UniProtKB/Swiss-Prot annotation:
Core component of the MRN complex, which plays a central role in double-strand break (DSB) repair, DNA recombination, maintenance of telomere integrity and meiosis. The MRN complex is involved in the repair of DNA double-strand breaks (DSBs) via homologous recombination (HR), an error-free mechanism which primarily occurs during S and G2 phases. The complex (1) mediates the end resection of damaged DNA, which generates proper single-stranded DNA, a key initial steps in HR, and is (2) required for the recruitment of other repair factors and efficient activation of ATM and ATR upon DNA damage. Residues 505-705 are annotated as: Disordered. Residues 505-514 have a biased composition (Basic and acidic residues). This is Double-strand break repair protein MRE11. Binds 2 manganese ions per subunit. One of its GO terms (molecular function) is manganese ion binding. One of its GO terms (cellular component) is Mre11 complex. The keyword Cytoplasm does not apply. It is found in: Nucleus; Chromosome. The active site is at H123 (proton donor).
Length: 705
């Protein structure tokens, strides 16, 4: 564009997914090589700063190796003596809400020659008690400028205010808006709720008008979806924007496209490393060099040379003439031929790839009318020839059955997110057990399980337990001050506490449904198949948080404690009093379970910090059994000869006669968790010493045979 002093040069990239496949011997360095090339291109083109659109890391808690490699790359390319030729003229304490509150190159203790601005994505989003992400680590090291981190407040679905980072270079003024990833369903409702999303415009000063600013928005959300409630429509965005960088979608659509009737252009750089082997990922990878002067911009796409070659093909066996349905050897020979041709094609060096790498090969096979073959066995012959010998083939049925649902072009469902089925099965398994719990809601356990597995939060279950115990203790103590609670009423009161929490969730779910109704009315026929929403979008392959938690509700109005997670949705619950999912299932779907007696005794022992010998523990167990035996006379003598139901069969049927006979034992187990140490000692003295013959009972029913 000429006149370099007034031209702002920005290198745009998204979805680097650093650390992806870090345990794979062949592909472990792919993400780092691509990211280093991006930084190298920024240095070669002498850009003013690098703009990243989220998902810098693949894992929410990246490994030490990943963090070290990332810091090494940023330190190598960002810390130098090159002068920074632009200024940030906005309130930096608002733009960068960390302890230091300023852009990194203005720190006198660091020589930052290449500033990096980034938002968070759905993979590296803030989580935990302090609402921190892995990007906060890089920000604390003064290596990146982390912006677009929203504090969801207000009532209902929440409220956010998007403040721009105001950048000035000569006569060019750029307002850089950042919006880190927010759950799509929630952000969708927020855009349709008046005044829920406030866009702050630059103030008029020094003879400048608002129209003098070139407005850029970078966000990380679903874009192409059939179900409009699980994505963000471009028409939700304000018309004053000039240019939008769309992250999260992995298909490279680097050329800016104008949105009809909106007046702005959208670029979708896509990912720099293939994380899901689908057709969209097979397109060449690029980054965008954006040059801005005044209110004009010039885009230049730059191909990435370090990306591992990836070739994708689709085969319909019934359409192949030389394949016999009754001869598996002919099927193998035909597929071998296709794989060999793709390997040969990828082995030829090109201008964009001077060095050849082992390629990624994926063949989608429509095996309608044929029998499948073992993909692992098929790939053994290609070890050392391709980078993914274990999953070259993926089998699918004919799409005719899918087309009968009224939705065409349904492909790649099993490949976009191959782990969805397993996670849904785990969630369903917890619900199917129908275990009657007295204190812990199943929804809380689902969330704790997700955080433990996906977020590597080792304290997830402990925090869940402590939070619910604290709520139950608080409720019992408040009622004990007003009314005298007898020993026999404790278990009833515990159940009432549980039901009250369930009822609160239900009420907030109904309240939240009011915000959903507007979005349902706007749905104009694109929601015939919900599964289609995962197919038309080439977004990252592990967007599991929305799936697992999409239909769940959380404890609304929980008392804040040291283990409460104020991350995105959890913060919303504490501040807005609404459910974090907005589609709570109410009390009808709440499943609870009975506390395991032995676990309850162990929890009581840990809480009271008593050190007991093994003989004392054995005596306590015997006394517990004796309480059960002493409760037998509550039944009429005519029932002594009646056959008892097996422990398995009694599960999930309410209390009945069995619960009545074991009532005092349940009281003792729960009282040991909720009451003080002194009360436990008094109960031990009051228990009978010589009970009738012992009867074996099952108190937990947590094992399914």
């Amino acid at each position: 564009m000429g006149d370099e002093s007034n031209t702002l040069r920005v290198l745009v990239a998204t979805d680097c997914h650093l650390g992806y496949m870090e345990k794979d011997e062949i592909r472990r360095f792919d993400s780092f090589e691509a990211f280093e090339e991006i930084c190298s291109l920024a240095e070669q083109n002498k850009v003013d700063f690098v703009l990243l659109g989220g998902d810098l890391f693949h894992e929410n808690k990246p490994s030490r190796s990943t963090l070290v490699k990332t810091i090494e790359i940023l330190r190598r390319y960002c810390l130098n003596d090159q002068p920074v030729k632009f200024q940030v003229v906005s309130d930096q304490t608002i733009n960068f809400p960390n302890r230091f509150g300023q852009v990194n190159y203005e720190d006198p203790n660091f020589n930052v020659g290449l500033p990096v601005f980034t938002i968070h994505g759905n993979h590296d989003d803030p989580a935990g008690v302090d609402n921190l992400s892995a990007i906060d680590i890089l920000s604390a090291c003064n290596l990146v400028n982390y912006f677009g981190k929203m504090d969801l407040g207000g009532s209902g679905v929440g409220e956010i205010a998007v403040y721009p980072v105001l950048v000035k270079k000569g006569t060019t003024f750029v307002a850089l808006y950042g919006l880190g990833n927010i759950r799509d369903e929630r952000l969708n409702r927020m855009f349709q709720t008046p005044h829920a999303v406030q866009w702050m415009r630059p103030e008029t000063q020094d003879g400048m008008s608002v129209s003098d600013w070139f407005n850029i928005l970078v966000l990380h959300q679903n874009r192409i979806k059939t179900n409009p409630k699980s994505a963000i429509n471009e028409h939700f965005l304000p018309r004053f924007l000039d240019f939008i960088v769309w992250g999260h979608e992995h298909e490279c659509l680097i050329d800016p496209q104008e949105v009809p009737g909106m007046g702005f252009h959208i670029t979708q750089p896509g990912s720099s490393v293939a994380t899901s082997l689908i057709d969209g990922e097979a397109k060449p990878k690029h980054v965008l060099l954006l040059e801005i002067k005044g209110n004009q911009y010039r885009p230049t796409k730059i191909p990435l040379r370090s990306v591992r070659p990836f070739h994708y093909a689709e085969v319909v066996l019934k359409d192949e003439v030389d394949v016999d349905p009754n001869d598996q050897a002919s099927v193998l020979e035909h597929l071998d031929k296709i794989v060999r041709n793709l390997i040969k094609k990828s082995s030829q060096p090109t201008a964009s790839r001077p060095e050849t790498k082992l390629p990624l090969i994926r063949i989608k096979v429509d095996y309608s009318g044929f029998s499948t073959i073992n993909p692992q066995r098929f790939g053994q012959k290609y070890v050392g020839k391709v980078a993914n010998p274990q999953d070259i083939l993926i089998f699918s049925k004919s799409a005719k059955k899918r087309q009968t649902t009224g939705v065409g072009n349904i492909d790649d469902s099993e490949k976009l997110r191959p782990e969805e089925l397993n996670q849904q099965t785990i969630e369903a398994l917890v619900a199917e057990n129908n275990l009657k719990m007295e204190i812990l809601p199943v929804d809380d356990l689902d969330i704790a399980l997700h955080d433990f597995v996906s977020k590597d939060d080792k304290m997830a279950f402990y925090a869940c337990l402590q939070r619910n115990l604290e709520e139950t203790r608080t409720k019992l103590n408040s009622e004990a001050d007003k009314f005298k609670i007898e020993e026999e009423d404790i278990i009833v009161k515990v159940g009432e506490c549980m039901q009250e929490r369930v009822k609160e969730r239900s009420l907030r779910s109904k309240e939240d449904s009011r915000f959903t109704s507007s979005s349902q009315n706007l749905d104009t026929g694109g929601r015939s198949v919900t599964a289609q929403s995962n197919l038309n979008s080439f977004s990252d392959d592990e967007d599991t948080r929305e799936m697992l938690l999409g239909a769940r509700t959380t404890n609304a109005g929980r008392k804040a404690s040291g283990f409460t997670r104020p991350s995105k949705d959890a913060t919303d619950v504490a501040k807005t009093g609404t459910s974090r999912r907005g589609r709570g299932r109410g009390t009808a779907s709440m499943k609870q379970t009975t506390l395991n007696f032995s676990q309850s005794r162990s929890s009581a022992a840990i809480r009271s910090e008593e050190v007991q010998s093994s003989s004392d523990e054995e005596n306590e167990t015997n006394e517990a059994n004796e309480v059960v035996e002493s409760s037998e006379p509550e039944e009429s003598p005519q029932q002594t000869g009646r056959k008892r139901a097996a422990p398995r069969g009694g599960r999930g049927r309410g209390r009945g006669a069995t619960a009545k006979r074991g009532r005092k034992a349940d009281i003792s187990s729960i009282q040991s968790m909720l009451m003080s140490k002194d009360d436990d000692d008094d109960d031990e003295d009051d228990r009978p010493k010589k009970p009738p013959p012992r009867v074996t009972r099952n108190y937990g029913a947590v094992r399914r045979r």
